[in-house]
């Protein structure tokens, strides 16, 4: 993490699944000496979750992964938030969630933030008149930029905001047409 150590909860999570990396002497010291200067993250949507208890059928480490993990036994299961609109891909549109994430990251780590992706995926069709009516994307970006502004107004530091990065993660999933 940004403090140069494995946090207790995350370390146990990795150990329970047999995923903890093999550490050699000096590795943890190296982590502590080489902390990040900023935090960069992608934000497209929020997810609501409910408990997903372990059972004979659902064992620790059992996961359902679609484009992103959707559930993990003993931890969580993604559920629809009926209070939010969603994109055509089912990603819930939540600008208040972006503001909350920014404030949480700033309060916890006190490192400047860079939003590396915050785009809006849609299926555009070029009409005969040659102009795509992109009101949904414009509204999405407007609301999310206002969320960044609100976070800045309470002291969150940013070093950048990118709508898309050079390599769009969604393109690998849905391709180009």
Predicted regions and their residues:
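Active-site region of glycoside hydrolase catalytic domains
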Residues: 1-177
């Amino acid at each position: 993490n940004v403090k140069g150590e494995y946090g207790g909860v995350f370390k146990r999570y990795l150990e329970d699944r047999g995923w903890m990396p093999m550490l050699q002497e000096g590795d943890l010291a190296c982590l502590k000496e080489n902390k990040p200067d900023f935090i960069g993250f992608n934000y497209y949507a929020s997810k609501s979750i409910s408990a997903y208890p372990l059972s004979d059928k659902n064992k620790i480490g059992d996961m359902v992964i679609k484009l992103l993990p959707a559930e993990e036994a003993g931890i969580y299961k993604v559920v629809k938030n009926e209070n939010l609109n969603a994109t055509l891909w089912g990603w819930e549109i939540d600008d208040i969630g972006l503001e909350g994430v920014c404030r949480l990251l700033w309060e916890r780590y006190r490192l400047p933030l860079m939003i590396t992706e915050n785009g809006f995926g849609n299926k555009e069709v070029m009409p005969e008149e040659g102009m795509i009516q992109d009101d949904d994307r414009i509204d999405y970006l407007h609301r999310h930029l206002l969320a960044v502004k609100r976070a800045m107004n309470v002291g969150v530091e940013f070093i950048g905001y990118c709508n898309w990065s050079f390599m769009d993660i969604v393109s690998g999933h849905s391709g180009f047409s």
